[in-house]
Amino acid sequence: MKQQLNQLAAYQPGLSPQALKEKHGIEGELYKLASNENLYGPSPKAKQAVQAHLDELFYYPETGSPSLRKAISEHLNVDPSRILFGAGLDEVILMISRAVLTPGDKIVTSEGTFGQYYHNAIVESAEVVQVPLLNGGFDLENIIKEVDEETALVWLCNPNNPTGTYFNHDELESFLERVPSHVPVLIDEAYFEFVTAEDYPDTLKLQERFDNAFLLRTFSKAYGLAGLRVGYVVATNEAIEKWNIIRPPFNVTRISEYAAIAALEDQAYLKDVTAKNAKEREKFFEIPQSEHFLPSQTNFVFVVTEKAQELYEALLKVGCITRPFPTGVRITIGFPEQNDRMIEVLKHFDY
């Protein structure tokens, strides 16, 4: 057994709504606003695609998701050979880590970011350098100081989970200009579709200059397909060819592929959902207490407080399950009624 597993723990999901009701004596409905899911759900066309192909459940998937690869390549205008799919970005991160890292290698990332970068590096006996956040965001200037010839991977999350902050195009371009060209820079854009900032990086454009800039995106967030597990990376042909050796042969299901293609084709629905999210997100930042919130470009708001558990329980009392962290609470943006309830709590909370 790998000894380094003793440094880690299995993922611990939050309590179910029913368990929370019993624990806290809550009556009425509880809304799950803890995992940054898109509460509006997927495009109706994606649901129709699932229904239309239920008779194919006894077939194995087509290995490598060729139909979805073609659809993504046309959508992004990239060569299909540069795309690799996983069962969510969790598996994409796992595959890259397994393919690249050897014992003693170093990865560089940030504290207070998506935990799977760290988790998979430890599994592969790699060293993890985590640079503290700066005002809730990635401190690219100090991250670059930790990158050297021995660095095997750099992980950037933009916008960052769980804080919601982002770095802009010029900042990323400057960073890439200073990273050794052989060091892969993985840019996780899981929340890309929710971004409204005009200076957000055009990572696909930057890939034309930087062969080591690799882009990760998912269908779990804005596309509303978290339960079907589809994520992907856009990298060089050479990298994808090697990483594809690690990929399990049937990792993305047939139904997932059909649903993702249909969701991708319905950009009008996606635009409507993200516009609703932006409108509701703005409501959180209209109250004076928003001085305690980190600026967000996602479908969640991070509230900075030393009383995270108290705030979590206060929000629970109005029917909203959120996610407490040591430095605050992450709130998934929900429907207007849910958001209004939470905003009222936030207006009167003693931070």
From Swiss-Prot:
List keywords of the entry alphabetically. Answer: Amino-acid biosynthesis, Aminotransferase, Histidine biosynthesis, Pyridoxal phosphate, Transferase
**What cofactor does its activity depend on?**
pyridoxal 5'-phosphate
Annotated NCBIfam families? hisC
Source gene?
Answer: hisC
| Protein name per Swiss-Prot or TrEMBL | Histidinol-phosphate aminotransferase
Q: Name one Pfam family in it.
A: Aminotran_1_2
Database matches in Gene3D superfamilies = Aspartate Aminotransferase, domain 1, Type I PLP-dependent aspartate aminotransferase-like (Major domain)
- Where, if anywhere, are coiled coils annotated? none
The entry lists its GO molecular-function terms as: histidinol-phosphate transaminase activity; pyridoxal phosphate binding
* Record field: catalytic activity: L-histidinol phosphate + 2-oxoglutarate = 3-(imidazol-4-yl)-2-oxopropyl phosphate + L-glutamate
Q: What is its EC number?
A: 2.6.1.9
Q: In which pathway does it act?
A: Amino-acid biosynthesis; L-histidine biosynthesis; L-histidine from 5-phospho-alpha-D-ribose 1-diphosphate: step 7/9
Looking at the keywords, is Transferase present? yes
On assembly, the entry states: Homodimer.
Q: Which domain of life is it from?
A: Bacteria
Tell me the enzyme class: transferase
* N6-(pyridoxal phosphate)lysine carried by residues: K221
Q: What InterPro entries does UniProt report for this protein, alphabetically?
A: Aminotrans_II_pyridoxalP_BS, Aminotransferase_I/II_large, HisP_aminotrans, HistidinolP_aminotransfase, PyrdxlP-dep_Trfase, PyrdxlP-dep_Trfase_major, PyrdxlP-dep_Trfase_small
Q: What species was this sequence derived from?
A: Staphylococcus haemolyticus (strain JCSC1435)
What biological-process terms (Gene Ontology) are attached? L-histidine biosynthetic process
Does this entry carry the keyword Zinc? no
UniProt family annotation: Belongs to the class-II pyridoxal-phosphate-dependent aminotransferase family. Histidinol-phosphate aminotransferase subfamily.
